[in-house]
Amino acid sequence: MNSSTSSENVFINSFSYLNQTSQAVISGNSTFANVINFPYRLGLSFIGAVNLQYEQTVKSEEIPPTLRSVFDTIGFFFSPYAIFCFVIAIVLNRFVVFYAVLNNGSRRTLPLWLSNVFHVSAVVVLAMVSLGPLTLGKDFKILGDPAFAQEKFLLNIFYAFAYSYCVETIFTIMRNSSPLEGTDYSLFELSIQFYTMTNNNTKFLDSPDYIIDCSMAILSRILIHLVEIFRLRNYRLLFSTIMNLCHICYLGIRVKQGGWKSLPFSVKFRHFPKLFSVSIICLSLLIFKLSCLIRWDPFGKSRNSCELLQFYPLSRNWKKYLNYTGEEDFSAMATKFALLLCSGTELMEKGIRREFPAINIPDNVNEKFFISGYLNELSKPYKENTSISFPKKNSSILKQRFFLMFPKSIIWIMKKLVGQVFFGFRDNKDEDIPDNDPSKMLKITKTNSLNNSAGHKEDIELELLNTSDDEYSEDYEPSEVESLGDSDEENLEEDSLIFNETRDALLDLFSSEDNEVHTDYNWIMSTSRILQQKLLSDKTLTRASILDTKLSEVDETFGTESDFDLSCAVCKVNERNTVLWPCRCFAICEDCRISLGLRGFSTCVCCRSKVHGYCKVHPVSDSK
């Protein structure tokens, strides 16, 4: 019995995760406590068995490479690099959000000395930790310091990088600016690289590529702080280009000596996009220069032989296409430039200079990009292209036109001056014409036909009302009441003869220069209305009755014109509310416009001209 008990104790001690008697949720030996504590102890035993199995598997050398990579990936998320990177990202993100809410768009200026102190402190910290990768493996006394041991200096470099990111982000956000960041050496990439180097026990002395890579990362952060201290943010791209070109030259020499496979995986993964972009740019420039060299004609009239090449517009305006400010990193600009060079192949059609479209957006859409002008709504009224292509400023055509037009301009100016002097001495005052009865009679007989306008309507009223009570027209027939008041017939005949002679003299006086009296057909047409009313009416004609008749006709004419038909010219049902451009026809409704557009109509239904677009209007009728 004792032997069996001792063997059980040895078995439990060899597997410590089985002994969970000390762990309990409810203390005591009651049935309720055992029911609760048994699943809890069973779960703890299972977790202990899994942990023991994991430790033994990691220590064994027979583990497959794929399974080891899975273990390394899981272990990275619990490493100090990943945890610190996650905490820094959350803190900076919350700071940016809360500061944007509290700031409320107002610009705040921080003291320069405060930001300079923190930037200088970041530079000092980065310089101190950079002594590790630069002097590692050398027999220097500084390596005796425990802070520069291989197990600790990678973590110190990572902490220095995190401090540099915090200083740059916080102080640039407080100045309402954008922080300067490096695309090659982000905090997350450095955490993965440092964890891999620590987990694999990589020696810096055996891998100088890691030393150069860490040195480039530190120099990029120091460069950011220096341009912030000296206020040279616009020159950051220049300094970054010089530094990266030197590093690319080193990588080229390194690949030439040991091959591409000799580089560590993290170095190849980080710098391959930059190297690929630089290769595309160099290859494009080389092909462009060779094309220019082939087209170059030393004896030709044209000085520039590359204008017909597809790359020529970009070579002249590449700064506008890239739209850089100088604050960008070299890797980001190289990638952007390479993408710009490669995106042109998607826009090219049969190689006819369609690689790079115009930068300015046109006012109207090209006709081949929409089905019909009835479907192209214009936000502004259509403007016809009335631009004239003038010759250049120093062209020979302009000089010839100037010399030809100069004498004509002088002659025109002289004529103008002589005319002003000549007409300046003339008396242009109008002579007053006596307001007598025969002249008024002549004026009435020479009036034009009645026009359908409101102004002419008022003129008719004034003309008929201001006429004197005496009537001298030949077709006037006095009433019987008026004839009784006359003296006798002989006096009337004498007066009429005198009046006729006076009228004939006035007509001769106001006739044309050739003394030929022309027949006034307007006067005949005006008297036809009086004759017609005389034949249709038995009453005596008076001036008031004629005036009432003419005014009623004018009112009827205005009434008919004001009632304009606003129904659609196509369906005759809906109200028209669409203006077509550029013909300006206001003829159709919205439903008919959509129907005509979907059917592919491109001409106006009224004038048959080309339709480029339409505008919606809201007509207001008198009935409303």
Swiss-Prot record:
A zinc finger (RING-type) spans 568-608. The chain crosses the membrane at residues 70-90, 117-137, 153-173, 210-230, 274-294. It comes from the Eukaryota. GO terms for cellular component: Asi complex; nuclear inner membrane; nuclear periphery. It catalyses: S-ubiquitinyl-[E2 ubiquitin-conjugating enzyme]-L-cysteine + [acceptor protein]-L-lysine = [E2 ubiquitin-conjugating enzyme]-L-cysteine + N(6)-ubiquitinyl-[acceptor protein]-L-lysine. One of its GO terms (molecular function) is zinc ion binding. Pfam families: zf-C3HC4_3. The keyword Translocase does not apply. Keywords: Glycoprotein, Membrane, Metal-binding, Nucleus, Transferase, Transmembrane, Transmembrane helix, Zinc, Zinc-finger. It is found in: Nucleus inner membrane. This is ERAD-associated E3 ubiquitin-protein ligase ASI1. It comes from Saccharomyces cerevisiae (strain ATCC 204508 / S288c) (Baker's yeast).
